[in-house]
From Swiss-Prot:
NCBIfam families from the UniProt entry: ThlDiSintTplARhiz (NF047696)
Name recorded for this polypeptide: Thiol:disulfide interchange protein TlpA
Regions of this protein lying in the Periplasmic compartment: 36-221
Underlying gene: tlpA
GO molecular function: disulfide oxidoreductase activity
GO biological process, one term: cytochrome complex assembly
Localization per Swiss-Prot or TrEMBL: Cell membrane
Transmembrane recorded as keyword: yes
Length: 221
């Protein structure tokens, strides 16, 4: 009679392959590899995809982890508050290219990233660009303000969402897999690129890419 049971030696490669696949999945979840893409696109955001394609050659070095938009995607009109507790929405910034960043004081990579975001805001903010860093601490509302003050990060505007709904809203469309999360948004509120994890936003790599996204260097591409 033929032995139909797989031998131990034949099962070993299968086990190894299963472990390898599981390990890869965990790595992707931790570092945001393979951000889920929108199955259908918003026609109003086609220009943002064209911008993403145009600046894609600049996504290297310190910003190599950026995932460029491959389908038109309008971001939710994220709701949060400013430093005075007044309500703000993402749509309040229409007309500007934005780097929307979600951060928290309990997130070590977030805290390390904040000085670079502050420097980026100082170098490029203006009529065409702004960093919108939204804190999602849910307990002590003074803690993030104290952190920014003690770190002498004075150029960033202060925005917060104590319910952390902005994170859930981005997670619902596959754009928030961990912290920090940053989305480069065009003047119409459409995704250009997304990164899960920190980046050196004050680096020359980042500055060149963002200048290109705002149109200042598009002609050079």
């Amino acid at each position: 009679m033929l032995d139909t049971k797989p031998s131990a030696t034949r099962r070993i490669p299968l086990v190894i392959a299963t472990v390898a696949v599981g390990g890869l999945a965990g790595f992707a979840a931790l570092y945001g590899l393979g951000l889920s893409r929108a199955p259908t696109g918003d026609p109003a955001c086609r220009a943002a995809v064209a911008t993403a394609q145009k600046i894609a050659p600049l996504a290297h070095g310190e910003v190599a982890a950026l995932t460029m938009a491959s389908a038109p995607l309008k971001l939710p009109d994220l709701a949060f508050e400013d430093a005075d507790g007044k309500p703000k929405k993402l749509s309040d910034f229409r007309g500007k290219t934005l780097l929307v960043n979600l951060w928290a004081t309990w997130c070590v990579p977030c805290r390390k990233e904040m000085p670079a975001l502050d420097e980026l805001q100082g170098k490029l903010s203006g009529p065409n660009f702004e960093v919108v860093a939204i804190n999602i601490d849910t307990r002590d509302p003074e803690k993030p303000k104290t952190f920014l003050k003690e770190a002498n990060l004075t150029r960033l505007g202060y925005f917060n969402d104590q319910k952390a709904k902005v994170f859930q809203d981005l997670k619902a469309i596959g754009r928030a897999l961990g912290m920090p999360t940053s989305v480069l948004v065009d003047p119409q509120g459409c995704e250009i690129a997304t990164i899960a994890g920190p980046a050196e936003w004050a680096s020359e790599d980042a500055l060149k890419l963002i200048r290109a996204a705002t149109g200042k260097a598009a002609a050079a591409l």
